[in-house]
Amino acid sequence: ETKDINKQEYLLRIKKVTDYIHQNIDQPLSLQKMAGIACFSPFHFHRVFTILTGETPTDYIKRTRIEKAALLLKQNKELSATEIAALCGFSSLSLLSRNFRLHFSMTIREFRSLK
């Protein structure tokens, strides 16, 4: 039962971090900051986050940024890809483009032209 309580506590702490990531996706997100939110050391946070989410914090952030970019590309045709890159926390359009192509196996332009 203590193990279940600990897991629930850990899940709540990681949920606080994922909420923070989603609310601040346009900002730089450091391991130290996220570990602090979860009240873990950076090493322990990385371990717990990866076990509970199935992704490293870095991979989770990258995927969340790309998914937000895809949503904005579809919903806001008036926003440029450069503006979307900034809104999603990518430091440049080329970084968004490279990650987008790796994730979706198509370019931003190809994605935007899909019906």
Where are these regions (language model features)?
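Terminal helix-turn-helix DNA-binding modules in bacterial transcription factors
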Residues: I14-Q32, I51-S91, L114-K115
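Short, basic interhelical loop/turn and adjoining N-cap
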Residues: I37, G89-L95
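Intrinsically disordered, low-complexity sequence elements enriched in Ser/Thr/Gly/Pro
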Residues: L11, Y60-R63, L96, E110
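Conserved short alpha-helical interface segments
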Residues: F100-K115
